[in-house]
Amino acid sequence: MFRVHLMEFCLLFMTGRDLQQISGNDTFKVGYLSSREIKELVPSFELQQKYHDLGVPTIEDILKFISGSVRQVILDVKVGPPLYEKGLAGSVVSSYTKLGCKNCVVWAKSDNIPRDVLRLAPDATVGYIVMMDPSTGTRTQLLRMRGAWVVGVYHPLIDGKLVKVLHARNKKVYAWTVDDEESMKKMLIERADAIITSNPSLLKRVMQDAKTQCLEDGFSLSA
């Protein structure tokens, strides 16, 4: 999954954490700087030692590199300064259409973004986010947005009942962000359709262990 921010002149793949690491300033947010200022940042000595040729890619850079080698690319669109939602959906659609990305999924915490994407590109694959509402402490509405076939659900909220409800509406359940082994196992048991993680090596091992256990117990699994 890649996070997309709209800057003054281009779409960048970057999180606030990325910017803080590169700049060495833990108060920076992506919207505080222009795209030119971000690209001119000099990474810390420690980062330069650990990684070579550091830079901030655009959406076109990433899609050219990754879209042909994975089953699906999730564009997690972040709304923020300086432009907020203005022109954001159009920029995303223009970028992935230009590169012929047929396996892109667009979602955002703001429902306006995927709705605007669908309006501009009716055949696009979009999703919406289900999480805990920080202002009320309750789960955001589960069934909403006509035409969205992917639902990104904050993984502690996922159980068999939630999966059953969404599957009954032909919606896929994508669990985010699952980085510990026990939660990964739970998502497999609950039949989440996809697991978003920052630790793909661990997830691969957990899935292989589950497959091995099923085979030992006499179940046959397709690849």
Residue ranges: model-predicted function:
Residues 1-7, 74-78, 187, 193-199:
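Short acidic catalytic loops
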Residues 1-21:
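GT-A fold catalytic core of metal-dependent nucleotide-sugar glycosyltransferases
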Residues 11, 27, 141:
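Short glycine-biased active-site loop of nucleotidyltransferases that positions the nucleotide triphosphate
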Residues 15-131, 146-149, 153, 169:
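Metal-dependent phosphodiesterase/phospholipase catalytic core, i.e.
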